[in-house]
Amino acid sequence: MYKHNLKKAFLAIAIAMATSWSTASAQLNDYFSKPASATSTPDDKGFIRRWMLLEPIVKENRTNIVFTDSYLRDAFNHEYFKGQKTVLPKDGAKVKVGDETLLWHSLESNLYNIKLFRFGEATKSRLYGVLYWAVTVVKCNEDIPNVRLAVGSNSASMWWVNGEETLLLSGDRRMVVDDAMSHRITLKKGTNIIRGAVINGPGMSDFCLRFVNEKGEPIKNIEIINPR
């Protein structure tokens, strides 16, 4: 009788675990898919949907009013893991942050905006008081001068293009399309590495990003070549 009950208990635990993972997968599939091809292009409005996302790093913040320029530069320039501004991550790669081991995920968003909160939820990560890292690679067939990086994020964020700080969105903010734009830059012929960090205390986390020309029109003649 004891062995029978023990067997039933183990079976119940196994079913619960399987259901939990299935639910997490379904949640992820609601917002993301695994890249099906080696390259992709921006959507019809120019938004870049393919990203390498790192599971969120714990960064204690009970409020977002602390997100001043100086606070953010300290937070974003702190080294949480080796090569965070130089390494091009691959899907499934692991990084060590303190006592935690976090994974990189190559994902294609089903929406124009990247739902970081849902990503964290699906990977069973902490949801509040966190910092997300995102990386994508843009390939150009020729130099594209005088473009602007246009970003909306919830909450604050910082963005680098080819290793240069290009845009900072400070303060407690909601995600709004083209909420902030960079100075004019040139996307060079070949590969351009885009890195971003998004920080949030309480509330949802997401971002949207595209490049626009001097008329404010989206740049679409580029390829996204993140490793799968």
Residue positions per predicted region:
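Aromatic-lined ligand-binding clefts that engage carbohydrates, nucleic acids, or primary amines
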Residues: P145-W160, I194
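Short beta-strands within extracellular/lumenal beta-sheet-rich domains
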Residues: Y128-K139
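Accessory carbohydrate-binding/adhesion or oligomerization-edge regions at the termini
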Residues: A26-I114, A197-R228
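Bacterial N-terminal signal peptides
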Residues: A12-S20
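N-terminal secretory signal peptides that target proteins for export/translocation
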Residues: M1-L6
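Non-cytosolic beta-sheet module surface loops
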Residues: C140, L149-S153, V198-N200
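Short structured motifs
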Residues: R118-A122, W133-V135, D178-S182
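Beta-strand-rich ligand-recognition modules
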Residues: V161-L209
